[in-house]
């Protein structure tokens, strides 16, 4: 085994798909997200086990391609960190796309079987249900790719999912060793991981650096796309903050009609008294791009009036901000 030494070390090895020895993963009949591009054919039916971000992304992609998808997860709620109304809309659209959701259901068995139309996979649920599907995507999370690092030699120990614990400066328990990205856990996004790497390097070498983690935008590439930044209705309610909501639907906007997205929506949360913008949630085409307009206003402590007083190009989806702002202000009055 090779050894490496340095005054400062940053661990950024990412993650790998979580595997279970009891699951007969073969890369084709039962596969993980890492195997998708190697599939030999498009299945007619697919069961996705795990409704995390990756499981949802692939479930909606396959469903959009015409595959009959069943989604299983032992949790009754999906993506609990996302605004509930946005998730409700996503779930509605998934069902409209002929997807079957088995939430609150745990898998107790999975085995390849022979069928009259070829090989199949039989999945048993603890509730007694059985699902027979052409293929199964096993997506129950990711594990830190730390297995080959010999962390013990450096005085570090990962948790049960291979992740490394860090402080707010991204330092591990060993002060000159830092860790960033997916290997430290949520939110496990490429964008946030890059920012964590920048901050870790600055902290390691005493360079002043500012960042606002509470304003990190999250992009979830389901179909339709989701992006959020700032507070949600649930977090504001839990904190006892008086707030109001403004909404705009893509079907109300010329660009939404042009591109044929009649289901997208943009939602603003703002303080009911000061009108300060508190959060933005978007579902639909271009959500992860549109979110940055709201992110900029949030970063500068702006109010919902910014959108009312600003002219947006026509026809663009950005006009949703103005429509949503008018909707919210009208609710106040």
Residue ranges, per PLM feature:
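Glycine/serine-rich phosphate-binding loop and adjoining beta1-alpha1 elements at the start
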Residues: 1-29, 45
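A Rossmann-like FAD-binding core segment of flavoenzymes
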Residues: 65-168, 231, 238
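Rossmann-like NAD(P)H-binding beta-loop-alpha module
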Residues: 29, 40-82, 189
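A short alpha-helix-loop-beta-strand transition element characteristic
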Residues: 16-18, 157-160, 207-217, 241-246
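FAD-site-proximal beta/loop scaffold in flavoenzymes
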Residues: 24-43, 130-203
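A conserved FAD-binding loop/helix module that cradles the flavin
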Residues: 83-89, 93, 174, 180-238, ...
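Short hydrophobic core segments
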Residues: 4-14, 48-49, 69, 131-141, ...
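Flexible, glycine-rich terminal cap/loop adjacent to redox cofactors
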Residues: 205, 221-232, 237-333
């Amino acid at each position: 085994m090779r050894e490496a030494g340095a005054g400062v070390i940053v661990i950024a090895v990412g993650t790998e798909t979580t595997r279970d020895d009891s699951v007969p993963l073969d890369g084709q009949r039962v596969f993980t997200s890492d195997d998708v591009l190697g599939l030999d054919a498009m299945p007619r039916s697919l069961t996705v086990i795990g409704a995390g971000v990756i499981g949802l992304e692939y479930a909606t992609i396959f469903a959009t391609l015409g595959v009959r998808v069943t989604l299983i997860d032992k949790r009754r709620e999906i993506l609990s960190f996302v605004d509930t109304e946005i998730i409700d809309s996503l779930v509605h659209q998934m069902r409209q796309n002929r997807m079957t959701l088995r939430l609150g259901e745990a898998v107790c068995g999975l085995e390849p079987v022979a069928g009259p139309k070829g090989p199949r996979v039989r999945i048993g649920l603890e509730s007694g249900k059985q699902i027979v599907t052409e293929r199964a995507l096993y997506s129950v999370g990711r594990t830190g790719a730390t297995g080959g690092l010999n962390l013990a030699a450096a005085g570090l120990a990962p948790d049960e999912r291979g992740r490394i614990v860090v402080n707010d400066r991204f330092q591990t328990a060993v002060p000159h060793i830092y860790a960033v990205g997916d290997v430290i856990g949520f939110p496990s996004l490429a964008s946030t991981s890059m920012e964590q790497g920048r901050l870790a390097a600055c902290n390691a070498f005493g360079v002043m650096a500012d960042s606002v983690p509470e304003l990190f935008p999250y992009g979830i590439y389901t179909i339709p796309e989701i992006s959020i930044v700032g507070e949600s209705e649930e977090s504001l309610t839990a904190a006892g903050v008086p707030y109001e909501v403004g909404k705009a639907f893509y079907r109300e906007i010329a660009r939404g009609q042009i591109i044929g997205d009649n289901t997208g929506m943009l939602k603003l949360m703002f303080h009911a008294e000061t009108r300060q913008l508190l959060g933005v949630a978007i579902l639909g085409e271009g959500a992860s791009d549109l979110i940055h307009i709201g992110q900029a206003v949030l970063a500068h402590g702006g109010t919902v009036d910014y959108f009312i007083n600003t002219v947006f190009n026509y026809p663009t989806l950005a006009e949703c901000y103005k429509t949503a702002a008018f909707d919210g202000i009208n609710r106040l009055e």
